[in-house]
Every structure is written in C-alpha cells, then in structure tokens.
UniProtKB/Swiss-Prot annotation:
This is Large ribosomal subunit protein uL24. Part of the 50S ribosomal subunit. It comes from the Bacteria. Keywords: Ribonucleoprotein, Ribosomal protein, RNA-binding, rRNA-binding. It holds the Pfam family KOW. SMART domains: KOW.
C-alpha cells in the first residue's frame, strides 16, 4: 500500500502522551508502521561515553505508530490523506480541503 505519510510531512499526534503536539516526520518505517517525529515521544536513554560522543542521559525520539498521526493541512487542522490521479500521476491530497499535498 502507498505511504500516506512521508518524511518531511508536518503531522499532529492524535493519541498518547503527546496528544495535540505537532512536529515534522524525520523517518518512516513502513514495515513496522511507525514513524519518528521530531520532538514527539521523547524517551531518556542512558549511553556510555565513547571517544566521539559524550555519555549520560540523552533524550531520544522514539517511534510512534502511524495510526496515531494525522497530516496537518494548510489551515493547521488534522486531515486524512487520500490519493487521486492528476493526468497520469498519482498524487496525495488533503481530504478536508482537497488541496494536493505533493504535485
């Protein structure tokens, strides 16, 4: 199935401890159906010091399920994403406004 949410999309969290927060997707794992969103679902990870990195308690963005994310449209509201054909090209569009997301 085609990816409705992609890297770089601005999304809002629908459920969980960060409900209502917005952020940009930094990576998507389609196999597990999860995405990493900047500044969302932060966990503290203890890491050992190495020659290149400082050790200690480092905040890290953890994956969040794609079903708990919604695309943010031009109005700043959460919307579902659909697909339609424009000419011979398949494009994503916001279902609330009908605007094409990626032309």
């Amino acid at each position: 199935m085609a990816a409705k949410l992609k890297k770089g999309d601005k999304v809002i969290v629908l459920a969980g401890k960060d409900k209502g927060k917005t952020g940009s997707i930094s990576s998507v794992d389609p196999k597990s159906g999860k995405a990493i969103v900047d500044g969302i679902n932060i966990a503290i990870r203890a890491t050992r010091q190495s020659q290149t990195e400082q050790g200690g308690r480092i905040p890290k963005a953890m994956p969040i399920d794609l079903s708990n994310l919604a695309y943010v449209d031009a109005n700043g509201k959460a919307t579902r994403v659909g697909f339609k054909m424009e000419g011979d090209k398949k494009v994503r569009f916001a279902k609330t406004t009908g605007d094409v997301i990626d032309a």
